[in-house]
Design a protein with these regions (language model features):
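Phosphate/ATP-binding catalytic cores across multiple sugar-kinase/actin-like superfamilies
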Residues: 6-13, 18, 22, 137-153, ...
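Extended hydrophobic secondary-structure segments that form protein cores and membrane-embedded regions
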Residues: 27-29, 159-166, 193, 224-228, ...
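Charge-patterned, long linear interaction tracts outside catalytic cores
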Residues: 243-261, 310
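Nucleic acid-processing catalytic cores of prokaryotic defense/repair systems
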Residues: 1-82, 159-160, 168, 191-193, ...
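Phosphate-binding loop and its immediate beta->loop->alpha context
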Residues: 52-184, 266-328
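Gly/Thr-rich phosphate-binding beta-strand-loop-beta motif of the actin/hexokinase/Hsp70
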Residues: 17-49, 101-103, 209-251
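Hydrophobic, small-residue-rich alpha-helical packing segments that form membrane-like cores
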Residues: 150, 167, 177-221, 229-230, ...
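Short acidic, glycine/serine/threonine-rich loops at helix termini
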Residues: 40, 173-177, 202-206, 237-239
Length: 328
């Protein structure tokens, strides 16, 4: 007889599960290269796992406080020496007054694990000299957001954290991340770091995707290919799913090697190969009119536009496919 794979099957709940989780708040953090998302999980009255995204407070592009599920992984220091994290900082990407490594920082997640010492000597924030510093400061802000949101929603202040990471995050990268969390009293052990493809698979079979169930046949050991394309990495993982008398278990049997391939690379390609040539053409200039350093500054200012162009192109492609009716 076939079994349907659900979170309840994947995580066998002991009879005293509710008693074990009572008085605790379980928070999952998707620490992304470009965007961070936080969710809270709980058991409903039927013992099923339920999760919901937290709306995190942050300043918008106009400086007003807003709440949103998506927190851009961007830090900036404004002209009043005030720290800005999230959407407000993201809106400053491309602003000529904000120079990467001086008063705005992003994509620092992918630089963890590189013991190169201070990287940003011109930083206007004394506490941000390397990617590890930026990560610590980002999590300080994130922790405050999580605690405030949990308090406002009546959740317990006893928060247990889990953080998703690229599938092949190396040991030194994990070490830097754990140190950044520990520096902010966010107790996370190495076992609470979950590979992003595994997290994507769990999300796939969660209650939000009841229409996309996976049926397991007895006597068969199916394998699932998980393709996780993020801003900083492209992770591919093959999971093996087994059914036994004790329930359903999964394990990784193959994981792609870590590689710097992701959405940010597409942004840079668009900026260098589409936006920059068009900008130079409209101003009767060529690349020879600028130094390599000047071109890098210009391209960095175009990255925000490139990302928006990429997103709009993807949305247009989805709409086009939805509009096409193929013959049966």
């Amino acid at each position: 007889m076939a079994k349907t794979l659900t979170l309840t099957h994947l995580f066998n709940m002991p009879s005293d599960a509710k008693a074990r989780v009572a008085g605790k708040t379980f928070v999952g953090i998707d620490f992304g290269t470009s965007t961070t998302v936080v969710s809270v999980a709980s058991l409903d009255e039927n013992g099923k796992i339920r999760s919901e995204c937290l709306h995190l407070a942050q300043r918008g592009a106009d400086g007003a406080m807003i709440e949103a599920e998506l927190l851009p992984t961007v830090i900036a220091i404004n002209d009043r020496n005030k720290l800005i994290v999230g959407k407000g900082a993201y809106s400053l990407k491309g602003n000529p007054d904000y120079i990467f490594g001086e008063n705005i920082w992003y994509q620092f997640k992918m630089e963890l694990g590189k013991d190169l010492g201070p990287r940003w000597f011109n930083s206007r924030q004394a506490k941000i000299k390397c990617p590890q510093d930026a990560t610590k400061l980002f999590f300080r802000y994130l922790k405050k957001c999580i605690e405030d949101t949990c308090k406002a929603n009546g959740f317990s202040a006893d928060i247990q954290y889990a953080v998703s990471i690229p599938a092949s995050f190396e040991s030194n990268q994990r070490k830097d991340l754990l140190e950044a969390l520990e520096a902010n009293d966010m107790c996370v052990t190495n076992s609470m770091l979950i590979d992003e493809p595994n997290a994507a698979f769990i999300s796939y079979i969660s209650h939000d995707y009841e229409a996309k169930q996976i049926n397991l046949q007895e006597g068969r050991i199916p394998k699932v290919l998980v393709f996780d394309f993020g801003a900083g990495t492209c992770d591919i993982s093959i999971l093996e799913i087994a059914v036994s008398t004790s329930g359903i278990t999964t394990k990784n049997i193959s994981i792609s090697q870590f590689q710097e391939l992701g959405g940010s690379d597409i942004d840079r390609f668009i900026a260098w190969n589409i936006l920059l040539p068009e900008l130079l053409k409209q101003n009767d200039k060529t690349e020879d009119d600028y130094t390599t350093r000047q071109l890098e500054v210009i391209v960095n200012q175009l990255l925000g536009i490139a990302e928006k162009l990429k997103v709009q192109a993807c949305k247009a492609q989805v709409q086009l496919r939805s509009a096409i009716r193929y013959p049966v």
